[in-house]
């Protein structure tokens, strides 16, 4: 395993490049399209990392950001309404996950996941986007 703010079972950082990663690459391509539609300026995004995590009861993520990423994202694969939310630190804003939800936010925004209280696993994929070098 590797050093991470995520205190849950994780894949490698570049799972979209691993064997069988073509399904994750499809998700990354979708995220890239959404980021281009939602960004206030035109840019061509590159996903420089992508990972999966499975949270079991008691697992959590400590508060952190993804600077210098332009966009960070998380996609919920298998969750229930009892699963832990995504919490944006120092705000009252939290997102309760549901299957198929994509959440995108600026990479500098601090966020965390409180301890998972449900017995149901919280399965998600996340990643970071930056501008493809020299292309705006």
List the model feature ranges, each with a label.
Residues 1-42:
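Non-heme Fe(II)/2-oxoglutarate
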Residues 43-115, 120-124, 128-136:
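Catalytic core of non-heme Fe(II) oxygenases with the double-stranded beta-helix
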